[in-house]
Amino acid sequence: MALGPSPYYGVSFFQFFSVFFSRLFSGSLFTGSLYIDDIQIIVFLAISCSGAFAGTFLVLRKMAMYANAVSHTVLFGLVCVCLFTHQLTTLSLGTLTLAAMATAMLTGFLIYFIRNTFKVSEESSTALVFSLLFSLSLVLLVFMTKNAHIGTELVLGNADSLTKEDIFPVTIVILANAVITIFAFRSLVCSSFDSVFASSLGIPIRLVDYLIIFQLSACLVGAFKAVGVLMALAFLIIPSLIAKVIAKSIRSLMAWSLVFSIGTAFLAPASSRAILSAYDLGLSTSGISVVFLTMMYIVVKFISYFRGYFSKNFEKISEKSSQY
């Protein structure tokens, strides 16, 4: 990462894009030094795109609450691996992903076990499991690191601490998710709508479930190492929820998810830098991204509602006029 004066220093919201794209098209991003704003854009783009690939099928399967639970409980698996290996920062991406997958399956088992044993609703058992495992992981993590504030950084992230080394893990994650989505697209779609029919076609349902858990776990691990759990969960669920309002097919659902994710990946760092330049106030970039995604969802929902309202009224007026 570059140590000299940043070209992004003191820029406004629109100047941020001018600086970034001028560096992109001039080749400075590939041949020159990378600044923290460049790294934020690259990492956010990778996380947002990988989240759109996995989130599309999570939303189709109505697994948003499960993804919310796993996004918190996955920390328990990562902490346990660190305890057993006595390593905190040198673990490989593969090891962390396997730990995350194991925790994701443990979370699903505990939710199922509590729901059926104690006869409570699935929402209640989900809340109990992720609250328990997440609190245990924070206690163990504070015990390991002697840092009482590390839980805040894991939830909100710390985009200002990103380095060039954070680019490689999220790049591997997006490539893995893209390959799985492309080659298993038909199986993922079919099993998401009708698992019985998919099984009759010879599609290995259990393997498809494991692939989705792998995608979810890989996204969360990449985000934990970069920007925290809040932004990961936002990019996993909200873009697909927005796209679901306007999409007419699965491919368009995924395409719109990518559009909203990529747009937020650019808007959040630009807004964070603009606020810092104008008011000397440093805000959480991941928090800003969640605000943008929520605003997009509200706007798209309102537009969809009013478009449906006016189209219905227009049809009624047309029917009445045709009668005369």
Curated annotation (Swiss-Prot):
Asked if the Swiss-Prot or TrEMBL record annotates the protein with the keyword Cytoplasm, the reply is: no
Recorded hits in Gene3D superfamilies, A to Z, give:
ABC transporter involved in vitamin B12 uptake, BtuC
Answer whether the UniProt record assigns the keyword Secreted to this protein: no
> What superkingdom does the record give?
Bacteria
One Pfam family from the UniProt entry? ABC-3
Q: How does it sit in the membrane?
A: Multi-pass membrane protein
What GO biological process term is on the record, naming one?
transmembrane transport
Where does this polypeptide localize? Cell inner membrane
Give the residue spans that cross the bilayer: 1-21, 39-59, 64-84, 94-114, 125-145, 165-185, 201-221, 226-246, 252-272, 286-306
Q: Which UniProt keywords apply?
A: Cell inner membrane, Cell membrane, Membrane, Transmembrane, Transmembrane helix, Transport
Q: Name one GO cellular component term.
A: ATP-binding cassette (ABC) transporter complex
What family does the Swiss-Prot or TrEMBL record give for this protein?
Belongs to the ABC-3 integral membrane protein family.
- PANTHER family membership: ABC-TRANSPORTER METAL-BINDING PROTEIN (PTHR30477), METAL TRANSPORT SYSTEM MEMBRANE PROTEIN CT_070-RELATED (PTHR30477:SF8)
What does this chain do?
Part of an ATP-driven transport system CPn_0346/CPn_0347/CPn_0348/CPn_0349 for a metal.
- Name-wise, this protein is Probable metal transport system membrane protein CPn_0346/CP_0414/CPj0346/CpB0353
